[in-house]
Amino acid sequence: MAHRPRWTLSQVTELFEKPLLDLLFEAQQVHRQHFDPRQVQVSTLLSIKTGACPEDCKYCPQSSRYKTGLEAERLMEVEQVLESARKAKAAGSTRFCMGAAWKNPHERDMSYLEQMVQGVKAMGLEACMTLGTLSESQAQRLANAGLDYYNHNLDTSPEFYGNIITTRTYQERLDTLEKVRDAGIKVCSGGIVGLGETVKDRAGLLLQLANLPTPPESVPINMLVKVKGTPLADNDDVDAFDFIRTIAVARIMMPTSYVRLSAGREQMNEQTQAMCFMAGANSIFYGCKLLTTPNPEEDKDLQLFRKLGLNPQQTAVLAGDNEQQQRLEQALMTPDTDEYYNAAAL
């Protein structure tokens, strides 16, 4: 494997300080070297277990510590999840992400999670989960079930992290990413813009991600969605150009990673989203629901794609791509359901 130089904080800071149009030009050049600039990967996220999370993440309406009006729900039945995955595939998604509001999954739930992964894979979709902290054995079980991606965000820089979360250390997050990688699962990890962090903190976040032994295959960049009842509900709005800069720097630093427009896209007008795609974003969560916050409606996404000449990327799951794939092919029931979130994001 060719040696990959490590980034320094001063190098990343210099990128953030570049004139915006110069930065966008560089990011677009990098993007075109590694991706078809007209292709956008489309994912759908389903909250398979909502609310009552014991963590204290100050941005999150799912924390049991804040009164946000969110009604807690138990882990969904496997067939309910698979019904949602079918609809997601029919709507054009190629990756189905399942998120649970936990500090970590309980052993009693692992068999259900494995069945969910196996069922999603059998449909020809990529499977992704975000379940909190994992043990080595849990990561391996999910890998054996066929899980393609595991999402576990770093959220912000190590220096600012303690201002946002105290119930889980930064090192615990890094340890989970290492366990996921060691199990053979692709890593999805990014952060949030708008927590009250400085530009240096944004640089520090991207530095951590890019300097991992292997950078994440997927890097979600979220804009804070301010939810009444959370400690960050009154934070200042994020300047659109600052967000676009973050996308561009992420693209330059991690040229082969998918950079995803995630939470907060509902707050962006078409022009801002277009500039994010120009800056190198090439993945979105699609549809009407972003876990517990709104996301642009599907038809609006498709209209924007048409205006910009973008196309949803075809599924990356190929025959034989996963050792479990042939074993996972099985007849699946296809009842209709309305209990489904056709979009997403962490």
UniProtKB/Swiss-Prot annotation:
Task: Show where the Radical SAM core domain sits.
Answer: 38-256
Q: Which pathway features in its UniProt record?
A: Cofactor biosynthesis; biotin biosynthesis; biotin from 7,8-diaminononanoate: step 2/2
Keywords from UniProt, A to Z, are: 2Fe-2S, 4Fe-4S, Biotin biosynthesis, Iron, Iron-sulfur, Metal-binding, S-adenosyl-L-methionine, Transferase
Q: What is this protein called?
A: Biotin synthase
Q: Which residues bind [2Fe-2S] cluster?
A: C97, C128, C188, R260
The opening ranks of the lineage are: Bacteria, Pseudomonadati, Pseudomonadota, Gammaproteobacteria, Enterobacterales
Q: How does it assemble?
A: Homodimer.
Tell me the organism.
Escherichia coli O157:H7
Q: Which PROSITE patterns match?
A: RADICAL_SAM
NCBIfam families hit by this protein: bioB
Q: What does this protein do?
A: Catalyzes the conversion of dethiobiotin (DTB) to biotin by the insertion of a sulfur atom into dethiobiotin via a radical-based mechanism.
HAMAP family tied to this protein: BioB (MF_01694)
Tree of life domain:
Bacteria
What's the gene?
A: bioB
| GO function terms (MF aspect) | 2 iron, 2 sulfur cluster binding; 4 iron, 4 sulfur cluster binding; biotin synthase activity; iron ion binding
EC code: 2.8.1.6
Q: Name one Pfam family in it.
A: BATS
Q: How is the cofactor bound?
A: Binds 1 [4Fe-4S] cluster. The cluster is coordinated with 3 cysteines and an exchangeable S-adenosyl-L-methionine. Binds 1 [2Fe-2S] cluster. The cluster is coordinated with 3 cysteines and 1 arginine.
Q: Which cofactor does it need?
A: [4Fe-4S] cluster; [2Fe-2S] cluster
Name the catalysed reactions. (4R,5S)-dethiobiotin + (sulfur carrier)-SH + 2 reduced [2Fe-2S]-[ferredoxin] + 2 S-adenosyl-L-methionine = (sulfur carrier)-H + biotin + 2 5'-deoxyadenosine + 2 L-methionine + 2 oxidized [2Fe-2S]-[ferredoxin]
| Biological-process GO terms, alphabetical | biotin biosynthetic process
What is the similarity comment for this entry?
Answer: Belongs to the radical SAM superfamily. Biotin synthase family.
Bilayer-spanning residue ranges: none
**Which residues hold [4Fe-4S] cluster?**
C53, C57, C60
SUPFAM superfamilies assigned: Radical SAM enzymes (SSF102114)
